[in-house]
Amino acid sequence: MKRLTYPLSSLRNIVEHFHCNTFHKPISSLSISPTLKSESREPSSTQDPYSLLKQDPVDICLSLWVKSFSSPPSATFSNLTGFLSKFDLWVLAYQRTCAHVTGTFPPRNAIHANALRSLLSLQNAVTRSGGKFRWNDKMNQYVRSPKDKISMNGGEGMSKGKVRRIIESEEPIFQDRVVHEVLLMILEPFFEARFSSKSHGFRPGRNPHTVIRTIRSNFAGYLWFMKGDVSEMLDHVDVDVVMNCLQKVVKDRKVLGLIESSLKFSDKRVLKRVVEKHGNDNGLGTKRRIEREKRNKTKKKILSDDEPKPDPYWLRTFYSFAPKEAAKVPSYGYCGVLSPLLANVCLNELDRFMETKIVEYFSPCKDDSIWKESIEDGCHNPAWPEFVPSSGKEKTRKMDYIRYGGHFLIGIRGPREDAVKMRKEIIDFCDRVFGVRLDNSKLEIEHISRGIQFLDHIICRRVIYPTLRYTGSGGSIVSKKGVGTLLSVSASLEQCIRQFRRLAFVKGDKDPEPLPCNPMLYSSQSHSNSQMNKFLETMADWYKYADNRKKAVGFCAYVIRSSLAKLYAARYRLKSRAKVYSIASRDLSHPLSESSNNSAPEYSDLLRMGLVDAIEGVQFSRMSLIPSCDYTPFPRNWIPNHEQVLQEYIRLQDPKFFCGLHRSIKREGLTLPQDEISEAVWDFKTLGAWRSKYENKREADDGLQKLDSQT
């Protein structure tokens, strides 16, 4: 019997590293002079915050995930205020918020007592019925950021202009971020257990790679594709729509009230942005703003000791290659990191609607080569889908759906009329449920032969002519030429060129010419090569599941290597890339130096003395060094590892499982896996069959006798 067990420590480590895949710029909390505070916040003098630290917060999060995944899908949760009252969760939320703001995760025992008392005051203001907590209350902050420069005894005040800019800022303050983290840790488990498996955006364990692998595995055989765009829901959504979706799972009034109050600020913020955008300043304000932005770009910034370092150049460059489906992050009112979760809560209604339509549309046909009987038939290899004939009147009708963020893709095996009908139903559903009116431009229908771009990958069909060999009636080998189609998922080189051109790495369209990498002008050769190597490694991983991975990564390596060569030619006065390559070699790993500086010591001497860093060559200088596409099979009903661990852990906690295990041990006894393998090999070697596939000894003897009579 095959058993899969996970220790509690393994499950604990997985739950401990759950996080929201949303990137926000680190910000500082408001620092207001004590003279501006409207009222003082007195923490509870009767409660010692250290006495409230009773549990490990990771164990509390673990219990939430186990409870949510073990509950039936239709279950609702009406008492979540008890989790809000657990001070251990607030301490963990404070630690995570500090990590976002300062870049370091403070240990629990390193948090100052004053910070714990302020955190307790914030908890009381949120949880108690008469609490005075308000979102974005910059004049009355309970908890301050560790980056706050104002000391506890007063400190120095700020100028009126800086105070006004902070008050008018739309960035959430530190204490709001703490409340966001607490609500996220409580709400995420209950909704993750009920989200559709068709959704992959802003969810733990899922990413664009899982979307691409799912398309390769499940979307073979579809002729018509519909690419939908509902990303306007990531910018603004009606408060009633969000609350109605939340109330299907959460019934706690306190939690719902906190979320509703944070969403109501959304309309005011949108209105403020519209007024600022269309304001009448006769061009003077815009001109000053542009000049100020230029000065800020060229101004050298000195980081504080506790300020996180900005992202390195290679990472900023890679983020610029983000596809449009993954570039937009939801932002609702003052919800902060809760916004992606709330967006998925709303769009989950669309996922469930499409799952119902998929079942209704399925119409099997015995004469087809795939999906003859069941919608779950997987008769072709999930890594390399088998040859799929075209659909017709007598062929199977089938549909599939997948969503990433505010963009989704629908594959239809049937006539185009069915795709048009499905588009009308989606438009009516979004108008009725979300109040969003979509036009046909947001729901484009394309044939597979034209290619569909999704997540900067092109989904198309390749026609191939394989030679099919089979054994004829007389025992001879028959070879026959066949025709088939193969689903292809390849990287979009046109989109890659556009991104390089936008970042000033190349110029031109059809035959792009590399440009020097000016941002690395004042960096050393070793640092420049190291930065570009990290970028190329990340790009090679991004195109990991593209059929043309070698071609795409090879083009990126050519652009980066040529850009660096032009930069070195200008820096070391070598006039051309050819001279740079002749000195530094093809991968630019040999040191370069100015020809006019003959008194400079040799690079080998400086390297031996530790005065310079070793120069690593630019990767992927030859096509043979670029890894091929990863065709690892992807299961059709794939679920992330943390969900597998949770399901297995819940199953091991069920007494019925151990009763069944005990009965099987009493009936079959204990055997080692090595013994079972040896028995199977011996049976196949001596008898040509495995005894264990029969239920009893009599069936085994009858089956073996039939095999003997046939031979």
Curated annotation (Swiss-Prot):
Subcellular location per the Swiss-Prot or TrEMBL entry:
Mitochondrion
Instruction: Kindly report the protein's main subcellular placement as a broad class.
Output: mitochondrion
Role noted for this protein:
Nuclear-encoded maturase required for splicing of group-II introns in mitochondria. Necessary for mitochondrial biogenesis during early developmental stages. Involved in the splicing of mitochondrial NAD4 transcripts. Required for trans-splicing of NAD1 intron 1 and also functions in cis-splicing of NAD2 intron 1 and NAD4 intron 2. Required for the regulation of fundamental metabolic pathways such as amino acid metabolism, triacylglycerol degradation and polysaccharide synthesis (cellulose and starch) during the early stage of plant growth. Implicated in stress responses.
Q: Which PANTHER family match?
A: NUCLEAR INTRON MATURASE 1, MITOCHONDRIAL (PTHR34047:SF2), NUCLEAR INTRON MATURASE 1, MITOCHONDRIAL-RELATED (PTHR34047)
The superkingdom of the source organism is Eukaryota
Descriptive protein name: Nuclear intron maturase 1, mitochondrial
GO MF annotation: an example: endonuclease activity
Question: What sequence ranges are listed for the domain Reverse transcriptase?
Answer: 147-459
Its GO biological process terms? Group II intron splicing; Group III intron splicing; intron homing; mitochondrial mRNA processing; mitochondrion organization; regulation of amino acid metabolic process; regulation of cellulose biosynthetic process; regulation of polysaccharide biosynthetic process
List the InterPro entries hit by this protein, alphabetically. DNA/RNA_pol_sf, Domain_X, GrpII_Intron_Splice-Mob/Def
Q: Which gene encodes it?
A: NMAT1
Kindly state which keywords UniProt assigns to this record, in alphabetical order: Endonuclease, Hydrolase, Intron homing, Mitochondrion, Nuclease, Stress response, Transit peptide
CDD domains hit by this protein: RT_G2_intron
Q: Name one GO cellular component term.
A: mitochondrion
**Ranges where the record places region Intron maturase type-2:** 484-653
Keyword Nuclease present in the record's keywords: the answer is yes
Enzyme Commission number(s) of this protein: 3.1.-.-
Summary of the tissues where the protein is detected: Expressed at low levels in seedlings and accumulates in adult plants.
Consequence of gene disruption: Slightly slower growth rate. Impaired splicing of mitochondrial group-II introns-containing NAD4 transcript and altered carbon metabolism. Altered fundamental metabolic pathways including amino acid metabolism, triacylglycerol degradation and polysaccharide synthesis (cellulose and starch) during the early stage of plant growth. Reduced sensitivity to 2,6-dichlorobenzonitrile (DCB) and isoxaben treatments, cellulose biosynthesis inhibitors. Increased sensitivity to sugar concentration of the medium. Retarded growth and developmental phenotypes (e.g.
Q: Which family does it belong to?
A: Belongs to the plant nuclear intron maturase (nMat) family.
